[in-house]
């Protein structure tokens, strides 16, 4: 999720502003608007994790993150910037964090706290390492090339990490056990309006 976090995207603030000729305020307005829109979209896309197998959903998130990174490398207007920030905030900060915590909560019955701590430790480590690493890359490459490198890293590395980390978890049996029971019992999910009214 680090690629969609503010600490990471902020590293590209200056080069993008200079190239597009926009002010700090204009960049901030675009960033805030795109972030709000992504959070609203997350409400709908996020709940879809209950409708699909976790492995398929994870690959969807990876593809979206890959496309977001690629789009960043082609920014040439404020419209492209808004779209790139929207997709990156949605796929990175939103869906990546959502998918990881949901997966652990669903499939880790023992040591769930340790597993959750491990993923947040990863984010803290990224907050320390990535700013230094990206600043170093700026000396060698353009910011567009850096984003292209990130896109390649995402599409090549993340699928391998997912497959290697979940190979010992029986995802299919767990998900097959849950879905038929719900269908047999004809359990109806509450709609958002009903939840709000009940509150």
Which residues make up each language-model segment?
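Intracellular juxtamembrane helix-capping segments at the cytosolic ends
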Residues: 94-108
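Flexible cytoplasmic inter-helical loops of multi-pass small-molecule transporters
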Residues: 166-189
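Hydrophobic core of transmembrane alpha-helices in multi-pass small-molecule transporters
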Residues: 79-95
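Short hydrophobic/small-residue motifs within alpha-helical transmembrane segments
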Residues: 33-36, 124-125
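Conserved MFS/SLC helix-loop-helix module at the cytosolic interface between two early adjacent transmembrane helices
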Residues: 40-78
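Extracytoplasmic
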Residues: 1-24, 42-45, 130-131
